[in-house]
């Protein structure tokens, strides 16, 4: 089996390569069909997915069985001021990959986000794959358009929405909190935005299960359990053994202090219903997955 990974140097792309090399992760061994898979890692310096012809030619040359698109413009605030760049990477890039995968009959696994949803409370019920997207930020809007292009142009597609992703690699909320906790006595974190922290180990494992599945469609794939960013930050400080005090603030208070920040959904908790009904939901509780992160973290920031 031949798997091509775009955005290979990001936190998810790196974790996918690690698991494919080790043939296992903390959750368990990889499926037999994935062992000895040929992995083609690629990043923007080798392939610009916003270039349609270059993308089609690259996919034709390598003939992958599966393409996992981890490439994205993920700076939520930055997307507001660099809308053209966000549109190219988050919408045009997936479109080009979908066109290319269709030409060689490859599966396309496209990674998306909880930010395609508006953040309405939904009666406190986590959003499953039937929920209607209505993004409130440029990031969410461009990611939703990318989803729509993938659905339209590649029949053998998986759209995997995740949330609050962190790992030992790259930049993420967990490592940011640790850095702040090491240099500050007190920080403030919003307490009225709720979602699902997701360890990249868990996400990568389930993406690889989908890579050998024929149950195409939209999937939610997040850590189990719901918390606020404030709750998450408190758990991080505890896990890192830091004494930094975390104080809660509202989104309105944060926005007043940071007027250039993008709107973010107040409620973006996802339910992994499709995962549970097909390949199985082995995503760990977010607190257990965070403890595992600290148990295996080498201290690098």
Where are these regions (language model features)?
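C-terminal amphipathic/interface module of NAD(P)-dependent oxidoreductases
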Residues: 263-301
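Mid/C-terminal beta-alpha module of Rossmann-like enzyme folds, strongest
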Residues: 206, 213-260, 294, 301
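Catalytic helix-loop patch of NAD(P)-dependent Rossmann-fold dehydrogenases
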Residues: 88, 93-96, 103, 107, ...
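N-terminal Rossmann NAD(P)H-binding glycine-rich loop of SDR-like oxidoreductase domains
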Residues: 1-26
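Glycine-rich Rossmann NAD(P)(H)-binding loop
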Residues: 189-194, 219-226, 278
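NAD(P)H-binding glycine-rich loop region in Rossmannoid oxidoreductase-like domains
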Residues: 49-89
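Rossmann-fold cofactor-recognition segment
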Residues: 38-53
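NAD(P)-dependent short-chain dehydrogenase/reductase
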Residues: 148-195, 201-202, 208
């Amino acid at each position: 089996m031949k798997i091509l990974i775009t955005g290979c140097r990001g936190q998810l792309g790196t974790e996918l390569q690690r698991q494919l090399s080790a043939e296992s992760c903390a959750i368990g061994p990889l499926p037999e069909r994935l062992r000895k898979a040929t992995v083609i890692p690629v990043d923007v310096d080798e392939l610009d997915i916003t270039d349609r012809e270059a993308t089609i030619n690259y996919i034709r040359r390598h003939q992958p069985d599966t393409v996992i698109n981890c490439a994205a413009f993920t700076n939520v605030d930055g997307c507001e001021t660099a809308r053209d760049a966000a549109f190219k990477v988050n919408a045009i890039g997936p479109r080009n990959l979908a066109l290319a995968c269709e030409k060689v009959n490859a599966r396309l696994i496209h990674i998306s986000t909880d930010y395609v949803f508006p953040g309405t409370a939904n009666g406190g019920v986590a959003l499953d794959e039937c929920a209607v997207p209505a993004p409130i930020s440029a990031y969410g809007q461009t990611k939703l358009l990318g989803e729509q292009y993938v659905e339209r142009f590649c029949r053998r597609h998986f759209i995997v929405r995740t949330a609050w992703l962190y790992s030992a690699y790259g930049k993420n909320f967990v490592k940011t909190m640790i850095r702040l906790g090491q240099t500050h006595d007190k920080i403030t974190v919003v307490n009225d935005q709720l979602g699902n922290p997701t360890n990249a180990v868990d996400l990568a494992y389930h993406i690889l299960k989908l890579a050998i599945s024929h149950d195409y469609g939209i999937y939610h794939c997040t850590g189990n359990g719901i918390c606020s960013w404030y709750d998450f930050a408190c758990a991080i400080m505890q896990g890192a053994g830091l004494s930094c005090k975390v104080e809660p603030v509202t989104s309105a208070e944060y926005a007043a202090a940071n007027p250039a920040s993008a709107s973010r959904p107040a409620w973006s908790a996802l339910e992994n219903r499709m995962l549970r009904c097909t390949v199985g939901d082995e995503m760990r509780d977010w607190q257990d997955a965070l403890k595992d992160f600290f148990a295996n973290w080498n201290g690098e920031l």
